[in-house]
Structure formats: structure tokens, C-alpha cells
Amino acid sequence: MIQQQTMLDVADNSGAKKVQCIKVLGGSRRRYASIGDVIVVSVKEAIPQAKVKKGEVARAVIVRTSREVKRPDGSYIRFDGNSAVLINKDLEPIGTRIFGPVARELRARKFMKIISLAPEVL
């Protein structure tokens, strides 16, 4: 569960290292986001010569959460940390590589480009 002010790691090579959630998209009263949800983030840490700079506002899709997510078959999945992949307005990833595993829930949300770039889908 991601909410405003949550710090997330970035799981791609866009150049950002840490981002902070500043808005959960999908309704004016929506408070929490989970795997596959799109959020608005502010870049808090970035490497030099990055595609995104520190202080920039971007969109991101959540690919891993510490909070467990229940699946239709009754199983749960959770990860060691909260991670996101930066995306543009067309919901395409900004980076060209994805680091670490991503959740299968992204496939149902039509993030096929992220699924294909990921080294492992859990």
C-alpha cells in the first residue's frame, strides 16, 4: 500500500534512484495504491546525466510492494521493498531496462512492455 509521502526505489535505468509519491491517481478521494497502480512522483535522488533530473515530477507504476497482495487463487505475494518504474504520459517506460522481479498483476493492467523487459515475473 503506497500513499502520499511514501519513498520508493526505482527499478529501471531512467537515472532516478529514489522517488516520493505525491499523488495516487484514480479518483479525488483515493488514498492508497498497490501493484499496477499509476502514481505521480517527485524524483528525490538521481544519478548525473540521467533521463530524469532531481526535483522533476513524473508518473510511475508500482511493480513491488512490501505489503502483501492477495491473488485470486488465495495465495499472497510480497517483496522486500517498495519499487516503481517511471513511465511517460502514454504509459510507456522511460528506461530501457528493468531491474529485479515484477509482479504478475502488471499483465492484467496491460503493462506488457514492462513485463517483457523484466528479468523475472512472479
Curated annotation (Swiss-Prot):
Classification of source organism: Bacteria, Pseudomonadati, Myxococcota, Myxococcia, Myxococcales
Gene Ontology BP terms: translation
Record keywords, A-Z: Ribonucleoprotein, Ribosomal protein, RNA-binding, rRNA-binding
This protein's record includes keyword Zinc-finger: no
A Pfam entry, by short name: Ribosomal_L14
Family membership: Belongs to the universal ribosomal protein uL14 family.
Name of the featured protein: Large ribosomal subunit protein uL14
Native source species: Anaeromyxobacter sp. (strain Fw109-5)
Transport in keyword set: no
Transmembrane segments: none
PANTHER family: 50S/60S RIBOSOMAL PROTEIN L14/L23 (PTHR11761), LARGE RIBOSOMAL SUBUNIT PROTEIN UL14M (PTHR11761:SF3)
